[in-house]
Amino acid sequence: MLLVTYWIYRIIAALPLSISYRLARVLAWLTESVFKYRVTTVDQNLRHSFPCKSEAWYATTRHRFYQQFADVTVEAVYGWRMPRNELEERMTITGWEPLISPDGESPKPGILLSIHHNNWEWLTQRASTAATAPLDGVYKPLHDRGADRFALESRGKWGATLVTMKGVSRHVLKNRRTPRVLALLADQSPGRREAIHWTQFLNQTTAFFMGPATLARLTKYPVYFARTQRLSQGRYHAELLTICEEPGTMSESELIEKYVALAEETIRMQPESYLWTNRRWKLEPPQATLETAPDEPEEIQSNP
């Protein structure tokens, strides 16, 4: 009975994607206009992140966000059964050579960072098909057991191993002799007991957890950033960018700052594609951080 959600997802996954997109239109309308799912949070996040925009821009971006959020939801479910050739066609890649080893050569390890932008579920699958080394996806278990089981099966479909946030250090030490790719979305709000780095992100003093930098120090792996762009409905492109080839040459704070800069640059390219329902700024910075925070960056203009 606890896994009812799992079988509901299985049934939806069996639908053709064209039918699922029709359901997505209904889902977008329900979440934005009927149930108003976190509409206040979305509005606040957009206004605080882009304070110089017009009312028309806020309304248009919010509406586009809910449409794409619904699309990504049904796409993630469809990904459970999507064949590899279709995945590689729907999410093309460039610049991933640092994680791809020619035949006969040792796999190349790395730490792969990204954000909740565009279709991050397909990105996990695509990364596991692209990288030569085994991919370990770091994740937080979902509260619903059925949804969690479905997500684990989907994300691990092409060989990825799913590791919880709490168990990642133990997993890294256990497999330290095997080159691996550690993949994680590092833009979530950290817990109060985690090591935190405060910085400016989207015009706000924001907390980032230091986990990626700690992993880089422990493993000595190069660190990369995966930037996805939405080309059209169900079509994406993932570009691999280098954050640090040798972690020893960069401080942990510098590494996080470079990640944050790439994250913000990516969001500004397609702001409607970020996960604005997330209560990203729920942690308040200490007063000392507020007093020493740099001035707000100049607003980068983007088309509404």
Where are these regions (language model features)?
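Membrane-anchoring hydrophobic helices of lipid-metabolizing enzymes
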Residues: 1-114, 119, 148-153, 159, ...
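Residue-level detector of family-conserved "landmark" positions at structurally sensitive sites
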Residues: 22, 56-57, 138, 165, ...
